[in-house]
Amino acid sequence: MRNSIDLTKKIKEKAFEEGFDAVGIAKVPGSSRIKLRTASLERWLQAGHQATMEWMKSPRRKDIENMLQGVKSILAVGLNYYVDTERESKDISIARYGWGKDYHKIIEEKLKKVAKFLETERPNAKWKICVDTSAFLDKAWAEEAGIGWIGKHSNVINSEIGSWMFLGHLLSTEVLEADKPSKPICGECEKCIEACPTKAIEEPFIVNSYKCLAYHTLENRDQELPENIINKMGNWIAGCDICQDVCPWNQKHIPSTTEPDLQPSEWILHTTKQDLLSWDDAKWKESLKNSALKRIKPWMWRRNIDSISKKT
């Protein structure tokens, strides 16, 4: 046990050294809440709330062993992406998660360094890195590891940095000492539910993608967006932060991220709607090459911008 305590301490220190803002550990198979979250996902899928995101149906999510055979521990990390600044132009809105460089690559590179450190301490250890593209219950395991709780808007909330937090996980065959799982403390607050213009949060923790502005601007591949979405878009052309903007845990002073690669791109802060309408595909591809927003194809950007101009 002494060895596992020492290794746990070293792994956590290494994770903080790499710049993560929240670090916690969960033991596999986890508490009964993991079963609860897995069952909740199944009900969400059965209701069709994933819309066209068929990858959400992957059965691999149901069993952590599908990700790494013999997994015993999970290191969960959170990386603050909040920047205390606003876009100059108010005629378009872009979700904060896409302001800097692609967070998937940033988190993966940092976790690789933690994994290599683990290898030096335990040469026989096997490991796997999971970011939010993996068939893995990332929010549930973040909650299990104690770095935050799942809010009613379905984002993970940390008491220090709110919900402006990217998640990453390092699965390992090594036994590490677990932290206490986080307990949801949203209480009776339903500000996120009340603020959503399309009522996409149909009940606490249940987001219907068919009604969600983020889904439609990021994932909907139709040539035109539904009229009921267009009428409620405001100026959102890439994602949506409304439910996070109103969350009380995001109202207190949150420090700006110190991660250089998460500082806002110049075009994100300064371009106007008219600027973006003049961009050809080559300009879009150049601007998006290091961004998580490259998931939105140039034609989708134009569709989204046209849509906010059509709203009644």
From Swiss-Prot:
Keyword GTP-binding in record: no
Gene that encodes the chain: queG
Keywords: 4Fe-4S, Cytoplasm, Iron, Iron-sulfur, Metal-binding, Oxidoreductase, Queuosine biosynthesis, Repeat, tRNA processing
GO CC term, one of those recorded: cytoplasm
Keyword Repeat attributed: yes
4Fe-4S ferredoxin-type domain span: 174-206, 226-257
Residues that coordinate or bind [4Fe-4S] cluster 2: 196, 212, 240, 243
NCBIfam families found in the cross-reference section: tRNA epoxyqueuosine(34) reductase QueG
EC number: 1.17.99.6
Protein name as catalogued: Epoxyqueuosine reductase
Protein source organism: Prochlorococcus marinus (strain NATL2A)
Family: Belongs to the QueG family.
SUPFAM superfamilies (UniProt xref): alpha-helical ferredoxin
Cofactor binding remark: Binds 2 [4Fe-4S] clusters per monomer.
Main location: cytoplasm
